[in-house]
Amino acid sequence: MEPPIQTYSPEWDEARKTRLGASDMGALLGVSPWDSPADVWASKRGAGRPQSDGSINTPIWWGHQEEPSIITAAVYEIVGEIDLPHVLTGWSWVIDGLMVSPDAVLTDEQTDPVDIPETLHALVEAKVVGLRSGYLWRLGPPQHVLAQAHTQMAVTGAVRCHVAARIAGAPVKVWPVDRDDELCAGLLNVVEQFWSYDDEPPHWEMLVEPVVRGL
């Protein structure tokens, strides 16, 4: 695995052109409420979808604005006021065909991001959930979010990802998601299979079905 790179840097922008992201995995597995495997193929292997024009006052823009506050609330919820871990944000990890950008990384000691594998404590994934999507969270993080969390753990080596969500303006709620090595391996295999085809194969649903069962 290559050393982590700064999110939104020129290196990050170049790397994402030829790699899937953790947020693509839900769609690739067919469990995303918004995108399908075909959308991922079009985005990464085909003509692609229109890119965001950077407009403000959109759901994505607001998500980025609220993210730091959600992380702060989540860390307090996770460990309390005493013995707060060191929180690192703005870093991405890259492997062949895949790049993950956790919203926050909790480490046991202050460290350079390059040394994180030895000191990493857990990840935090922050979500802003609107009123209309709140039903997806009635039993906890939905499958597409679990796929994202496990993909991040698969690449970083973390053993836990705390999914923190602010649903319909309510206080932040945190769900700890523990690493499942079998699921992580299955997700990495899905990434490998994705890049081995030029077009979406007709049997793709059968290929990913064992991984979906593990979510």
Enumerate the language-model features and the residues they cover.
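Charged, glycine-rich intrinsically disordered N-terminal tails and low-complexity linkers that flank
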Residues: 1-69
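Residues that form generic nucleotide/phosphate-binding pockets
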Residues: 15, 28, 40-44, 77, ...
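Enriched - but not universal
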Residues: 15, 37, 44, 64-65, ...
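Acidic/proline-rich low-complexity IDRs
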Residues: 19, 27-28, 83, 87, ...
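Nucleic-acid nuclease catalytic cores
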Residues: 60, 76-102, 106-201
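A structural signal for well-ordered alpha-helical segments within the folded catalytic domains
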Residues: 68-72, 150
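Helix-loop elements that line ligand-binding/catalytic pockets
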Residues: 199, 203-215
